[in-house]
Amino acid sequence: SQAVTEQEAEALREGRTATEEELLQGLIFAGEELPCDRPSGTFYLPVDMDEEDWETGTFLAEGGGVKVYLLDNPMEDEKQEAVRTGKSYRLLAVSEDVYREYAVVFSGLPIVTLDTDTGAEIRYDEIYGTLRFYEADSKKDWVTESVMSGHIRGGSSRLNPKKSYKITLYKKNQTGSGALRKNDVSFLGMRSDNEWLLYAMYSEDTKVRDKLSLDIWNESGALEIDGEGFYGYHMEYIEVFQNGEYWGIYGLMEPVDYKQLDLTGEGEAQPVEYLYKQKDAGVFELKGSWTEQTEEDFEILEAYRAYLEGDDSDFKAEIGNLIDVDNALDVWLYLQAVI
């Protein structure tokens, strides 16, 4: 066992000096460097909550000259309970003449780390770096790494202390030129894509409502819509680290876009289908890759808005020619149930 008794730990400390300097540059498990919250000196290892037994493996210090020992033995605890309570296990790192205590926490969620090239926090302007995705249910080929760019997303939620992000994944061209191209990756059974959203769920303390509401829609209203696309999106819980700091629980989400809805776009087969996004009150933008946007592209939207603001009798007589009324009713009923 890698765990030592208190007497053995005292023997390891004897003759060495305690230090507050960074002694452990990285902690390795199953061949991968673990995420770390550097301010607290806490490393995180995602584990499979469907298995009662602890994962097998050894903690190793990255590089040479440092050895690590567990001062608390996880094997003495029930795994699911240790994860649920967020129990912290002390870890002793020793070199030839100094030592320092760290901690290990076992998580039941996948983990994403975002490390920017400059070390600056992800803000409104696009910034590049590296994303690493750690699976929880496997320790074989369990980490995916990609070049990434990211920026803060959202409307009023941008003012919250905990931000949501849009992440785009890239990989380097094999020509060796250093140029980047989009990198499609599938996470947690969701679609393979290069664009992903990290949803902060800041205003919802339980972190349950948004996920439950989304799952209800996906299993009801989204299935009632004819078409090749999927008129919903998936979200899975993860934990996020940014530049060596723990950022909390997030929702990893697919974006709602032309690919998700399987819409026709500019220059494709007729009729052209449009996806609009409301930016502010009365202000809409056309989503997708368009070389130009004309008044014609907004005619459908403006016709719908005219019916909404017009006479009730005209609305009742004509709205069925413009929208899928049954679908609109499904959406209304869904919103009454979840809001």
Regions found by a protein language model. Give the residues of each.
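A sequence-level detector of short linear motifs
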Residues: 35, 143-144, 248
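A conserved hydrophobic secondary-structure block that centers on an alpha-helix together
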Residues: 187-248, 307-330
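Conserved NTP-binding catalytic cores of kinases and kinase-like/nucleotidyltransferase enzymes
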Residues: 49-51, 60-65, 72, 81-86, ...
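Short loop/turn segments at secondary-structure transitions that flank enzyme active sites
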Residues: 110, 120, 171-173, 204, ...
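Extracellular structured ligand-interaction cores
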Residues: 111, 126-128, 162-164, 193-195, ...
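Predominantly extracytoplasmic/ectodomain segments of secreted and cell-surface proteins
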Residues: 2-85, 95-105
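Short polybasic amphipathic segments
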Residues: 10, 24-29, 90-91, 128-135, ...
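ATP-dependent phospho-/nucleotidyl transfer catalytic cores
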Residues: 183, 252, 258-338
